[in-house]
A protein has these predicted regions:
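Active-site pocket scaffolds in enzymes
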Residues: 69-83, 162-282
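A short glycine/threonine-centered beta-strand motif
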Residues: 51-53, 152-154, 208-210
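Histidine- and aromatic-rich segments of cupredoxin/plastocyanin-like copper-binding domains
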Residues: 2-146, 159-160, 229-232
Length: 282
C-alpha cells in the first residue's frame, strides 16, 4: 500500500486533533506568562523537550537558532541540525544550542500539529528585553511526517542479526465508533500476549489503516527503527515511533528483559479505547 493511502485505495486526509484543549502549556505555563530561563550570551544550552501531552503533537520551532538534535527518547543519535523538529506524543528530544554572543531573547516554541496555536519558553541571554509572544503562530503547521525519522541514525545501533520472529500489527479503528484496536481487536484483560521467547530478535511491523497518526510505544525495551514503507535502513534507537496514516513502520528489539510488558498507542484516548496489547516471556 502506498504511503498516504487507507484501505480500499482512497486518498487519506489525516484527522490530526480529535480532542480540543483550552490551552497548551510549557512547564505548566502559557505564553501569556511564559517561563523565562536566564542563559549566558555565547553559551551552550541543552534542551530536553518532553511531549507529555495526552493527545497533541507539535513542531518545535527554534526561530533564528540552529539546534543540534543529539538524542531521541534518551538514546544518542548522529547530530541533525535544523531549526524545526517534529515531536509526537511521548517522544523526547535532546537539542543542543550554541547561542550568539550578543544579548537577546530566544523563544523556544511548540506549534500544535496542523494548527497555529503554540506554547513555549523564553531563553533570556544577557538580560535582554522580552517581547510578548502571541499564542498563535503566523501560519498553521503541517501534519507530522517521517522525514526526520528517516534522517536519524543511532550512535549505538542493535548488533546486526536476522529477526527470529515478526509480528504484524495493523492499527485499526475509526472516528465514528471511536473504537481503536490492533488487528481489529480491541484489548481486554482476556487478550493473549504476543508470543515471543527470551533471547529472540523480534520485529514489529506497524501498518496504519486509520485516518489518524499513532505514536506506538513499547514498555521495558528500546527498539530500533529499521524500515519505513518497505525501505530498510539503520535508524534511531528509541521507545516511541510515529506511524502516520497509510504508512508502514518496522522496529526491531531484543527480548532481553523478561516480564509482562505493554505495547500501545500513546494517544491516551486511543489506548483506553483498545489500541493496546502486551507481550510476555520468561
Amino acid at each position: 500500500m502506498a504511503p498516504g493511502m487507507i484501505m480500499g485505495g482512497a486518498a487519506a486526509k489525516p484527522d490530526l486533533n480529535d480532542v480540543t484543549y483550552d490551552a497548551f502549556l510549557a512547564n505548566d505555563r502559557t505564553l501569556g506568562d511564559p517561563e523565562v530561563v536566564k542563559v549566558e550570551p555565547g553559551g551552550r544550552v541543552l534542551l530536553r523537550i518532553i511531549n507529555s501531552s495526552s493527545m497533541s503533537a507539535f513542531h518545535v520551532d527554534l526561530g533564528a537558532l540552529d539546534g543540534e538534535l543529539i538524542a531521541v527518547d534518551g538514546f544518542p543519535v548522529a547530530p541533525v541540525v535544523a531549526r524545526r523538529f517534529l515531536i509526537a506524543v511521548a517522544q523526547r528530544l535532546d537539542i543542543r544550542l550554541a547561542l550568539p554572543r550578543a544579548p537577546a531573547a530566544y523563544p523556544v516554541l511548540a506549534v500544535l500539529e496542523g494548527e497555529s496555536r503554540q506554547t513555549g519558553i523564553i531563553l533570556q541571554a544577557g538580560g535582554a528585553p522580552i517581547a510578548r509572544i502571541p499564542d498563535t503562530a503566523a501560519m498553521a503547521s503541517a501534519a507530522l511526517t517521517l522525514d526526520l525519522e528517516r534522517r536519524l541514525r543511532a550512535v549505538a545501533p542493535l548488533e546486526p542479526r536476522k529477526a527470529d520472529r515478526r509480528h504484524t500489527l495493523n492499527l485499526t479503528g475509526n472516528m465514528v465508533s471511536y473504537v481503536w484496536s490492533l488487528n481489529n481487536v480491541a484489548w481486554t484483560k482476556d487478550t493473549p500476549p504476543l508470543p515471543i521467547a527470551k533471547g529472540e530478535r523480534v520485529e514489529l511491523l506497524f501498518v496504519n489503516q486509520t485516518p489518524m497518526p499513532h505514536p506506538m510505544h513499547l514498555h521495558g525495551h528500546e527498539f530500533q527503527v529499521v524500515e519505513i514503507n518497505d525501505e530498510r535502513f539503520s535508524g534511531a534507537v528509541r521507545d516511541t515511533v510515529l506511524v502516520p496514516p497509510g504508512h508502514r513502520v518496522v522496529v526491531a528489539f531484543d527480548a532481553n528483559n523478561p516480564g509482562l510488558w505493554a505495547l500501545h498507542c500513546h494517544l491516551l484516548y486511543h489506548l483506553d479505547a483498545g489500541m493496546f496489547t502486551t507481550l510476555r516471556y520468561v
